[in-house]
Amino acid sequence: MKKNIQQTVTELVSPVVESLNYELVDIEYVKEGANWYLRVYIDKPGGISIDDCQAVSEQVSDLLDKDDPIDQSYFLEVSSPGLDRPLKTEKDFAKYKGELVEVKVFQPIDGKKIFEGELVGLKDNIIVINQDGHNVQFERDEVAIVKRVIKF
């Protein structure tokens, strides 16, 4: 049920978000405590401001009120995915190629579940990072999450 809501909302709001010149990065529909949250993550070159979030929130809220794809009450949140956003799409992997990433796997590989290295890319569902001069490959379905590592 939750996945269907995410897919339905994605299909519904994606054209609106794109028409406002933003990228729809992800949608989450989660329960926290007694409340449900619909989180819409957007991005654009140069980053996202509060005004950007407000503009998208107003349009998406109006659309969701009209089409009403969710039965129960929920809170709508629109935000940036953050600097350490998870990489999910082929576009994400292409965009952040050459950057430092952290790969977390479901099952340990040689006793490790977390790997850090430079993102080489994603091809044929194989994620490749360069770790200390050696390419390390991961089957995409073995990977729990890939996210950027931000060094300050």
Swiss-Prot record:
Keyword vocabulary terms for this entry: Cytoplasm, Ribosome biogenesis
Gene3D superfamilies membership: Ribosome maturation factor RimP, C-terminal domain, RimP-like superfamily, N-terminal
Any GO CC annotation of this UniProt entry: cytosol
Record-linked SUPFAM superfamilies: YhbC-like, C-terminal domain, YhbC-like, N-terminal domain
InterPro entries: Ribosome_maturation_RimP, RimP_C, RimP_C_sf, RimP_N, RimP_N_sf
CDD domains in UniProt: YlxS_C
Subcellular location: Cytoplasm
Major place of residence: cytoplasm
Pfam families on file: DUF150_C (PF17384), RimP_N (PF02576)
GO BP annotation list: ribosomal small subunit assembly; translation
Family affiliation: Belongs to the RimP family.
HAMAP family xrefs: RimP
Function: Required for maturation of 30S ribosomal subunits.
Name of the protein in question: Ribosome maturation factor RimP
Biological source species: Ruminiclostridium cellulolyticum (strain ATCC 35319 / DSM 5812 / JCM 6584 / H10) (Clostridium cellulolyticum)
